[in-house]
Amino acid sequence: MNFYKVFIFVALILAISLGQSEAGWLKKIGKKIERVGQHTRDATIQGLGIAQQAANVAATARG
């Protein structure tokens, strides 16, 4: 029975220490995903601006 308690204690300590070290690479992945989202947002805004200008040119050309 003592072995079981020691095993659980060691497993908890190991899980806590690994959980804290895992946050580093998880945070990096999160930042990469966030950066991709920002680039997508910026490209969409720029694309909408170009489309609006093209629509204005087309409307002006029609008279």
Swiss-Prot record:
Q: Where Arginine amide occurs along the chain? A: 62
Gene Ontology cellular component? extracellular space
Keywords assigned? Amidation, Antibiotic, Antimicrobial, Immunity, Innate immunity, Secreted, Signal
Q: Does the keyword ATP-binding apply?
A: no
Tell me which Gene Ontology terms the entry assigns under biological process: antibacterial humoral response; defense response to Gram-negative bacterium; defense response to Gram-positive bacterium; innate immune response
Primary site of residence: secreted
Query: Which protein family is it in?
Result: Belongs to the cecropin family.
Q: What is this protein called?
A: Cecropin-2
Coding gene?
Answer: Cec2A
